[in-house]
């Protein structure tokens, strides 16, 4: 779990060294949602965390893309679960990942990319790592084991999360990234809304459905059974 930046001002920046010193070295920011930081704010917290010996973790999706496509799909197909992934395409993640990496390079700061879901985003990470930039990337079991075909199921709402499930090609790329070390963390992004909550809040539009799935209790068993036992990962990896 991370503390989250929802705005940046002098008072927030001044408290970063204290927070890190108290044992909370990683803090999180978003490039989408109402509490997102703009590029200037991201640069400020990247630099402040660098100086304090901390690390910024970033949820990477382009807010303008999600808003533009979401508004369109809310009018055209509000109850189709596929409207969710269509409102957050792969380029939405890749643009934000690329931008965060450029900002981190400018600030001369390390950065942590959370819940990577696309081959396009992974390509950006690999390019930065190859150039010597200190970048840590994570993905999650849901992006390794499920794809967007799940949204066609009867209760496709239960798979709504952000970023959304992707293609089979993206899944394969993420396994490769985890195996070769480009992705060094498999986390959960645990967010356990019930199916009943999703049905209720998403009944008028799937774009109002709360996003997230549980995963804390299944992460290790899934990585072992689907990764190690299927030859995708070595046990030491």
What are these regions (language model features)?
Residues 152-158, 196-204, 218-222:
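Short acidic (Asp/Glu) and glycine-rich catalytic loops that position anionic groups and cofactors
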């Amino acid at each position: 779990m991370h503390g989250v930046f929802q705005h940046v001002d002098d008072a927030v920046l001044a408290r970063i060294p204290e927070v890190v010193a108290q044992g909370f070295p990683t803090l999180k920011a978003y490039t989408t949602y109402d509490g997102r930081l703009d590029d200037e704010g991201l640069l400020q917290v990247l630099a402040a965390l660098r100086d304090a010996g901390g690390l910024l973790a970033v949820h990477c999706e382009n807010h303008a893309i999600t808003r533009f496509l979401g508004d369109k799909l809310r009018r055209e197909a509000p109850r189709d679960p596929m409207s969710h992934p269509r409102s957050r395409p792969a380029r939405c993640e890749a643009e934000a990942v690329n931008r965060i990496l450029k900002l981190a390079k400018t600030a001369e700061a390390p950065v942590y990319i959370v819940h990577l879901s696309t081959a396009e985003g992974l390509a950006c990470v690999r390019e930065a790592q190859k150039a010597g930039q200190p970048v840590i990337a994570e993905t999650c079991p849901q992006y390794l084991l499920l794809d967007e075909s799940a949204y066609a199921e009867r209760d496709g709402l239960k798979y709504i999360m952000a970023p959304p499930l992707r293609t089979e090609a993206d899944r394969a790329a993420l396994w490769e990234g985890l195996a070769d070390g480009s992705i060094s963390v498999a986390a959960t992004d645990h967010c356990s809304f019930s199916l009943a909550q999703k049905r209720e809040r998403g009944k008028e539009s799937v774009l109002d459905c709360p996003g997230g799935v549980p995963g804390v209790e299944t992460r290790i068993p899934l990585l072992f059974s689907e990764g190690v036992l299927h030859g995708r990962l070595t046990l030491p990896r």
